[in-house]
Amino acid sequence: MKTNQNSVNSLNKILFVNFSKFALGLTLCIGLTLTSCKKDNDLPTPDGAALTEFFETNREESLQTFTLNATTGGVITGSEGTKVVFQPNAIGLNGNPVTGNVTIQLIELYDRSGMLSLNMPTYGSKPNGDHEVLKSGGEFFLNAIQGSNQLELLIPAEIQSRGVNPADFENFQVFRAGDDIKATDLWEEADEDGDGETDDAQARDGQGTAGGFVMYNAFDTSAFGWTNLDRWYNYTGATTQLYVDVPAGYDGDNCSVYLTYDGEPTALARMDIYDEDTELFTEHYGRIPVGQAVHFILVAEIDGVLHYTIQAATIVNGHTEIMAEPQPTTQSQLETLIDALP
């Protein structure tokens, strides 16, 4: 049987065109798949465990240690000027005074860069459950050990904040936030004497290290752990709920978001709620003043390198801050940037 050559050529042409379309389509599909995978692989992989370790390591490295005779008591002075006064036989174990030398441990924080590096923001819980930012006059961790034994205070110790110029002095109340160095509790008003009232620090005056006249706050603590000189921010006027939208790949498990208030160098709030449905950070009760000038700070650790974003903003009603992609930095560089904020 004789085959029509034109028909064969036409069929081959159709088959070639169809195969070419198929091959092109397959190539496009593979290309899109590879591109999608590449984009997924390009997403940052913040390490939440490494960030937690970063904070905890900073706390351990910030510990100052002093040797004190527990029988006679005495005074220790931190590198930032904090003083702690111990009465004789004030330190004990299982309710009994210890004798001989003990090791006193102290952390003192007076600026928001240190507060952020140790993840100790000035964010408190009111008796009614509301959460609100605090203005701090100093955060302190105090502890005592003897060998491997954790000790206790049998008689309250007095903590004295560093001295400041009388024109800069403010009265503060006393807050507590957990006994352990790793504590992440919110600050709560202290009531050491049990009278139902928040303890007020006492205003004192004296001679500073440079010889000038200074004022400082002093208060008693009956337990080791974290204490803070604070007052509630107590702003007036309209407030709003605040939201922070972090870049893809970041969430409540692998990064931290903080808020500084312009003009308040010792106030540092943390956005402590992450909504997995909306993928937004927020805080509890909408206590952010409308019109407040602030700076948002996003911190994460990626492949062993600290990353950050700092953004200035003025709060508007229903504010949502969209954070830019964090950039690599060092701890010292980040602290310098934070200390330079208004």
Residue ranges and their predicted role:
Residues 12-27:
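Sec-dependent N-terminal signal peptides
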